[in-house]
Amino acid sequence: MNSEQNNYFFVGTKFGDDDYLEYFRKEGKWELGWHNNEENKQYQKMLKLFNKIKPGDVLFAKSTYVKKNNLPFVKKDDLKVSVMNIRGMATVKEILDDGHTIIVDWKKEYIEREWFFFTGQETIWFPSDITYRTKETNQLIKFAASDEIIIQDYDYFLNHPNWKKYKKLESETMLRNDFLFDYSGILKKSKNLILRGAPGTGKTYLAKEIA
């Protein structure tokens, strides 16, 4: 019996201009890039994280970018916010000894979702390694792993010293109308949509608007 705690890693699926997520899903695997370029310093850095992954751990396919408009909260107009699009979830079954390949079981019908502020751009991001970000990491993992749509606690991040520069002080943080259409589309796919979130994050408002 393995008593080790399972860990959660966020991994990229784009190498250059090519996106391999559908290929990985079809093949039941995920791969770290830099094939035939193992001397690359970035590969060597990622290999250290790769070697931390074990059977039972969870991989989240992600892409990271910035957005200025069409956000689900009010912010200062001139600032761009870091966004992590979480696109898939897989459970690790086996790690091959080639330094690149992990055999996984991809979760079917995973609903893509966007997470803001606390994000990672590396090919392998292990937020649990950031010991002073335990609270943010726990929120992120709960958000990413949920079968249901959870509203991120935007107020928490907008009032956090690291991200409060984005807060528009003269306006109360609220869900934007143009973002509601994204949830309406999700609702069409998931008839058992349940909204969760901390008090004051807009669950009741959102439910009324997409009804």
List the predicted regions and their residue ranges.
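Hydrophobic anchor at the beta1->P-loop junction of P-loop NTPases
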Residues: 195
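Short, Lys/Arg- and Gly-enriched loop/turn segments at beta-strand edges
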Residues: 66-88
